[in-house]
Amino acid sequence: MNETDTLFAPASGFGRAAVAVIRISGPAAGGVLATLGGRLPTPRRLSLRSLRDPRDGTELDRALVAWFPGPDTYSGEDMAELHLHGGAAVRMRVLATLARLPGCRAAEPGAFTRRAVLNGRMDLAEAEAVADLIDAETEGQRRQALRQLDGALSRQVAAWRAEAIDCLAAAEAALDFADEGDVDDAGLDAALFDRAARLRDAVAATLRDGHRGERLREGFTVVLAGAPNSGKSTLLNALSRRDVAIVSDSPGTTRDAIEVRLDLGGLPVLLVDTAGLRETAEPIEAQGIVRTRARIDTADLVVALVPPGGAVPDLGPGCRPILIVRTKADLFAGSQPAGDSADVTVSAHTGAGMDDLLDAIQAAAEDGLGTGDALITRARHRAALEACVAHLDRVSGSAGGLPELAAEDLRLAVRALGEVAGHVGVEDVLDRLFSGFCIGK
């Protein structure tokens, strides 16, 4: 990949629209804009221009254009934007014209943000926050992504890393000048191990967050489980307010898990319909039941459905929190059978009890996701911080031992903290991250 090429890509959605934005970034961005529009406009102000094909002078569009000289831009490079009329023909003709200009090429997904990272405009954790903000579907996800984009994690990790570097410098000083009498080995060693232990405790405390950030980012998983014909698919359709699952009187209709995303009070909930739990000799249905068991084991909440005359299904050992729901309330008299232990009674057909069920799921999600802001939002962050704690733990345990070992573990702790913001080992992570971005970002 040539990082000195000038990139271009649509920065707005495809399809018919009022405006289509094309973003240009790289050393030739100003020249490209002048080639199409005749002259460079005043920086950072929209200007009306007639855009023309440089081959024959054909007018492409009358558009608003903007010129952003680097390095104070999103990508850290010279940038330009073309605000075209939103028709597909206009957009495609301008893109084709850009592709013919020397030094220009179409951008890959995430290419502009990749350059922002490489040019120091943001770090890796902040770039991940850009992706999370684009993918955010609920208010809670939006707030969390913006907090990360503002550098909440990056600032804290930078402070920890600075402390770890200070400890490493002290350890290396003790090694380098031990024979010169300028360093008080005993006093320094005691202070060093104490500082390393405090740093370890601070990072470890952050890790004890119940995985709130990752769960908010990925969604609180709620699995609907029960015997065949207990009303799982009907309930899924009612909760999602659309027909996403096939409903049939024939047992065993659902074989594969069906997922629906809900927004409950700003929290993302992933609702999963599963195959009915029963003993069966039918191999495909049996495989679906195995998958149901696996989803139950990893769920944040299991909604156990009990039809009239039925019993609470066997969910297996070690099941996650369970909400027992009596279904098909319209089929039996009274609000609830005597002695029933159900938490909620519902009828997907009449709507009775549905608000109570949604309230119960939302309460479980609020309890599971917590109310505090989380610093850690990705498994990559957690793995790096766990590695840091492990290295600092070894430093604390090496008091009185070889100082070379303590110095090496401090060096590895610094490296682990650097991985969060992308100070080390960034290329592979960039490739994985930006492959999931949209074109033009």
Swiss-Prot record:
Domain named TrmE-type G is located at 219-366
Taxonomy-wise, where does this protein's organism fall, top ranks first? Bacteria, Pseudomonadati, Pseudomonadota, Alphaproteobacteria, Hyphomicrobiales
Q: Which cysteines are joined by disulfide bonds?
A: none
Record-linked NCBIfam families: mnmE_trmE_thdF (TIGR00450), PRK05291.1-3 (NF003661), small_GTP (TIGR00231)
Q: Report the record's Gene Ontology biological process terms.
A: tRNA methylation; tRNA wobble uridine modification
Keywords attached to this Swiss-Prot or TrEMBL record, sorted alphabetically, are: Cytoplasm, GTP-binding, Hydrolase, Magnesium, Metal-binding, Nucleotide-binding, Potassium, tRNA processing
User: By what name is this protein known?
Assistant: tRNA modification GTPase MnmE
Q: What does this protein do?
A: Exhibits a very high intrinsic GTPase hydrolysis rate. Involved in the addition of a carboxymethylaminomethyl (cmnm) group at the wobble position (U34) of certain tRNAs, forming tRNA-cmnm(5)s(2)U34.
Q: Where does GTP bind?
A: 229-234, 248-254, 273-276
Q: Which residues bind (6S)-5-formyl-5,6,7,8-tetrahydrofolate?
A: R23, E81, R121, K441
Name of the gene: mnmE
Checking InterPro entries in the record gives:
G_TrmE, GTP-bd, GTP-bd_TrmE_N, GTPase_MnmE, MnmE_dom2, MnmE_helical, P-loop_NTPase, Small_GTP-bd
The keyword Transcription regulation belongs to this UniProt entry's keyword annotation = no
Single GO term (MF): metal ion binding
Obligatory cofactor(s): K(+)
EC number in record: 3.6.-.-
HAMAP family, alphabetically? Answer: GTPase_MnmE (MF_00379)
Q: Name one Pfam family in it.
A: MMR_HSR1
Q: Which family does it belong to?
A: Belongs to the TRAFAC class TrmE-Era-EngA-EngB-Septin-like GTPase superfamily. TrmE GTPase family.
